[in-house]
Structure formats: structure tokens, C-alpha cells
């Protein structure tokens, strides 16, 4: 059992690498949400458990690289909340991955926190933007991430979840809400309410995603589909070098670089006899 910035991780394999080695460069990205304030984080009371008729890899894949599904999957909810679709900027957004862990993000500090529909939350973020930037650096945005294999974050919503397999076609989802420990009590209520609105079993976005996860699992179980190869080639030539960002960095959120890295890591582990056989990517 080891911990990182207030989160505890456990593994039954005595030969597994240390948590520091396992996370690798991805620790830099986790600090954006776990260590942007000197007081650290705390969990808001309660968690949500629900089940989906899907393979666990579908939701994990969605969080490792989230943005290109959003404009049509969540179109009705986004228009209802904002009156229009948000604008995406490929030139100001990225995919980044390390050993199958993935983070996708843009340079808008508010990011997807805007969907929480809370003026108090937006005011808090704007007031603290300079402080967070001083602590972490300017490139510290709010979007989605997945720690391989099945721990996902929505940083702007301050929620994280685990996708627990209950067989090849069923997943149990556990969801928590967290916040900086120094944040006002009223703000904690706002985040809880915002997550219930957006990413709970009855939330306006979670219901959309659940339809995708379940229907993709069902369709891909078909005989004809299983005979074919699926294409995940978006952004094949998008790799860049970035002076601030860690790991394997790709230009644009509209990408499948992180999805490819996720499945490569899964294949590496499935094919390896021991941890020594698992390559560092």
C-alpha cells in the first residue's frame, strides 16, 4: 500500500513496481488536481455506486481522451445549459500520456467546470487562478484523465471514479467528489450539487455517456463486428515536443493518441509474463 498526495493505492502483486515508478511522469498531471493548494484535498461525504451493462474499458477509454465525443453525445445538454456548443481550439489543447495513463486538456483555466452551472464555483476558480499558476505553473488546466487501468478524473468537476469490472459486459461505477480542504463549506455544497446535476446516474451528461458505453459494448459483441478491425487513427502525426508538459505530448484534444496508448498498455500487460517484460512507454 502506497499513497500519493492524499490518495491511497494498493496492489496484491509483490513484484509490482513502486507507485512512484508506476505513475511516472503522470504525477505531474495529478498534481494539477491533487496539489494545487497548500492545504491539500479532502473528500466530500458520500459516494455514488451504480452499474452499467458495459465493458470497463469503454468508460476508461472515454476519460483518457474525452473531447471529440462531446459535441454530439452531449449536444442537447450543452445547448440547454449554454445556448450553444462550446468552441474547441486544437491549437490550444493537448493529449498527454505515460505508461497508459492519459490526460487531455485545453489552456482555458475554467475548462469544463463551467458545466457545473454555479457562479460561486466560477468565481472561486477565477479568484485562485493566479495562486494555482504560481504553485504549479501556467499550464494547469481542467479536463479529464485516467490513471491506468480504471481510475478516472474529471478535474473541472472535482470528481473521480473507479470502473470495477463485474464480468466482460458489466461494470460497477463508484463516484466521489473532492475539493481543496481550504475551500469554503458553501463551495463544497456547490460542487456536490453540480456533480449531481452533471455526472451522477441521473446527471445530464452521465446518462448520455451510459448510452454510449452500453450500446458500444452490445454492438461490438456482434459476430460481424468481431470479424473486423476498428480504426483508432486520429492524430497519428500529432506528437510534439513541449518545454513544460511531461510524457508523450500530442497537439489537440480532438485526437486518439491517448486511446492508443491506453490499449497499448493493456496489450503489454496481457502479453507479459512478468513485470520485467512490460515496456516503459
Spell out what each predicted region is:
Residues 3-281:
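C-terminal catalytic domain of Rieske-type non-heme iron oxygenases
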Amino acid at each position: 500500500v502506497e499513497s500519493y498526495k492524499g490518495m491511497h493505492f494498493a496492489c496484491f502483486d509483490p513484484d509490482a513496481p513502486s507507485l512512484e515508478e508506476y505513475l511516472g511522469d503522470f504525477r505531474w498531471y495529478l498534481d494539477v488536481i491533487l496539489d494545487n493548494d497548500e492545504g491539500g484535498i479532502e473528500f466530500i461525504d458520500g459516494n455514488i455506486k451504480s452499474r452499467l451493462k458495459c465493458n470497463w474499458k469503454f468508460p476508461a477509454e472515454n476519460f483518457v481522451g474525452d473531447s471529440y465525443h462531446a459535441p454530439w453525445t452531449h449536444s442537447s445538454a450543452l445547448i440547454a445549459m449554454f445556448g450553444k456548443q462550446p468552441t474547441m481550439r486544437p491549437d490550444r489543447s493537448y493529449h498527454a500520456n505515460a505508461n497508459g495513463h492519459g490526460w487531455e486538456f485545453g489552456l482555458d483555466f475554467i475548462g469544463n467546470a463551467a458545466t457545473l452551472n454555479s457562479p460561486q464555483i466560477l468565481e472561486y476558480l477565477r479568484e485562485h487562478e493566479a495562486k494555482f499558476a504560481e504553485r504549479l505553473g501556467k499550464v494547469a488546466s481542467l479536463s479529464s484523465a485516467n490513471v491506468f487501468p480504471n481510475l478516472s478524473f474529471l478535474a473541472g468537476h472535482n470528481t473521480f471514479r473507479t470502473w470495477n469490472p463485474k464480468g466482460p459486459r458489466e461494470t460497477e461505477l463508484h463516484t466521489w467528489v473532492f475539493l481543496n480542504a481550504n475551500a469554503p463549506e458553501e463551495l463544497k455544497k456547490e460542487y456536490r450539487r453540480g456533480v449531481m446535476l452533471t455526472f451522477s446516474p441521473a446527471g445530464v451528461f452521465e446518462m448520455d455517456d451510459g448510452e454510449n458505453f452500453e450500446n458500444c459494448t452490445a454492438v461490438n459483441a456482434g459476430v460481424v463486428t468481431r470479424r473486423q478491425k476498428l480504426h483508432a487513427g486520429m492524430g497519428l502525426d500529432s506528437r510534439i515536443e513541449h518545454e513544460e508538459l511531461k510524457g508523450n505530448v500530442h497537439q489537440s484534444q480532438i485526437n486518439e493518441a491517448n486511446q492508443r496508448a491506453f490499449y497499448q498498455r493493456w496489450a503489454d500487460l496481457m502479453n507479459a509474463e512478468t513485470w520485467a517484460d512490460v515496456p516503459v512507454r
